[in-house]
Amino acid sequence: LPRHLSILILSKELVSDPRPAPRTSLFWVIAGIVVVAFSLRAPIIAPTAVIANIQADTGLSSSGAGLLTGLPILLFALATPLATRAIRRFGPETTIILCLTGVMVGTVVRSLGSTSLLLGGTALIGAAMTLGNIAIPVLIRRDVHWNKIPTVTGAYSAIMNIGSMVTLLGTAPLAALMGWRWAIASWAVIAALGLGYWLARMRRERAVQAALPSPVAVSEKSPSPTIIVRGASSAKTGDLRLYRRVVALLIAAFCGQSAAYYATTAWLPLLLSESRGLPQTSSGATASLFQIAAVIGAFGVPLLAHRTKLWVATAVVAACWVSLPIGLLLAPDAFMVWSILGGIAQGGGFTAIFSIIPRVATSDSLMASASAKVQAGGYLAATFAPSFAGWLNSSTGSWNAPLLLILGLTLTFSVCASIAARITERH
């Protein structure tokens, strides 16, 4: 309880605590997060490496091909209420098992045959990933000490980016050896390995739980402790007000973060090809720096937050984000620098946002609710941002308008995330 509350305990005969849940070591917590994170983005990326093969084999139109990446992102937004209910009913561990099972099955179904199976499997993957998107922050908040949350969140963000990069690099060579169907289906092995880990971990934790002594029965004559907490009601109200204010700011911040990320990912290669005259291979390689540099941001935020404050790290990320569109507008010849800075920002921005939420979420339920609201808003914005940026380009015949859109989105992240980080550290 906060120091200013006055606590009066009228009876010292306290009831014995129920059996505590077995505590998982930090190593195994991180290991569990890593095996899930690898499967939370990679299956979406895999088809993009062989999209021409898929279209030639299935007759999928360009708009249908866009659904292979757009549909999961839309489901990230629409399926968050389902994920929240699953966590409340089954707990985060079982929800993660459902997530990995869905990703594994969806990845296989997607490669089986017709266009309907291709899109149906993709939808299943998106819905299953949403379960993991919400469950992982809940696990981090519950099992990780608060001062290590940014580090573990950074590892989570970094592994998602590494998984995407590995999948992007590996799918095309696999397709050359065995065809695109086997190539994209092969990534189900990663989800299967993660599923095996989590099933074994749950069995172990249940065995440890069963071996713990039963709760001490309380005699009917034993008086229950009477605790009078003066000011507790007002403190709780104040905490909820802070929680709601921070969550509202983070919803806006993640809208800017996600929309800027997906718009940049969709159009940066073409932008560099058309505006700087780069060949397709060079523009793609330069754009890949935007993805790879995310690992620096994911780990850089917790390191900087440890040495200074989280709001300082968030402000640095904000400056890097804003430099991407401004740099491409004012100094386009330095596009490699701006791509790297933007990549650092997109990895660090995710880490910063999901390191702020646990500071105001005082329970697993509040954590799940906040994570769901933030991700629903962010991914809904991300669903429409690439199309809107493309429309701006075709309407104006220039990349200036899409870059101004990305500037507005990154400024939204910068202002809202920085304010949220600052006010949480004041309380």
Regions found by a protein language model. Name each.
Residues 78-113:
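Conserved MFS/SLC helix-loop-helix module at the cytosolic interface between two early adjacent transmembrane helices
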Residues 364-398:
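A late C-terminal transmembrane helix in Major Facilitator Superfamily
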Residues 116-124, 337-342:
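Paired small-residue
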Residues 123-158:
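Cytoplasmic helix-loop-helix junction between adjacent transmembrane helices
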